[in-house]
Amino acid sequence: VASGVASLTFNRPEAMNALNEQVITQLTDIWKGLEEDPSVHTAILRGSGKAFVAGADIKFFVDKIEDDKIDDIREFTERGHDILNAIESSRINTIAVMSGLALGGGLELAMCCNHRIGVEGKTMLRFPETGIGIYPGLGGTQRSVMIAGVECARYSIIAGNWLDSNLAFSMGYLTDVVGYSGLEKAISNIVCGKVDHPNHKYQPRNPEDKLIKQILETFGDGWQNRLMDPASGLGPFEERQSKFIVRNAPVSIKMASELIDIANQSREDPAVGLQSELDGLDTIFSTKDALTGLRGVLSGKRVQFSGE
């Protein structure tokens, strides 16, 4: 901490700073200390190496499923929810510096921050979960809808598309995009109070962007009938999205879709959707596809999902 500004660095570069039990415990303890220090007004979160945070620790999930200890996964995720909720509701102004990859849980962590700075040509965001047999369980299905709207949440989570810095900014996942040389100045401007918090809830920042328009049209009402029925006469963009979706885990798609809808329906009480994410964990981690998909990540092999 220096001059009221706390700097937090996730330092597991060998694991791309993935969240595990130890990291969640450390973050919780550190955050409690910052909240209790009245001199702290800003916190800057960064990752060491090439990633901000590349999701949760996959081996932890596989080990717990194989040992029939899914309760431990739920407990870990509940603790993750607690600290992410604390960061989101904090009096402290928070800045996520996303100068590399932010995947899954890392993107979910960043979405709890007031400011999310990306670097042009370097920042890449993605929710890979439905492609590995699970769904974003640290608030991703809910905060994506709050930040970017239902259609962009479906594009990001259900289809699992990569988001470069410009698209992520147009959607709202990033609040600032700068060249690498301008990164420290952008951070300084926020610390000095020269940047207002963005406010465009439940819709993308730039709905007039050409790609955003396609996303709004493709992932609006009736998207399942269009994209999951190969005989429906799809255009090139829709056909690509359909291919992404049908290779993902069916139960993951179904549950993620339902959670995204809950986020849209419970705007007055976001806690409803966050609890729904937690309530579905036992179901999703008990599927054969979850173990298949998570093992596939560790082995580096593409897998086929059975829908079980």
Question: What is each residue range found by the language model?
Answer:
Residues 83-132, 136, 156-165:
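Glycine-rich beta-to-alpha active-site loop
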Residues 1-11, 15, 158-277, 283, ...:
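Amphipathic alpha-helical segments at domain termini/boundaries
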Residues 8, 12, 26-27, 45, ...:
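Terminal peptide-recognition signature
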Residues 1-48, 71, 85, 220, ...:
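Conserved CoA-thioester-binding segment of acyl-CoA-metabolizing enzymes
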Residues 47-82, 102, 131-133, 305:
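Glycine- (often His-adjacent) and acidic-residue-rich active-site loop
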Residues 141-151:
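Hydrophobic, secondary-structure "cap" segments at the distal end of domains
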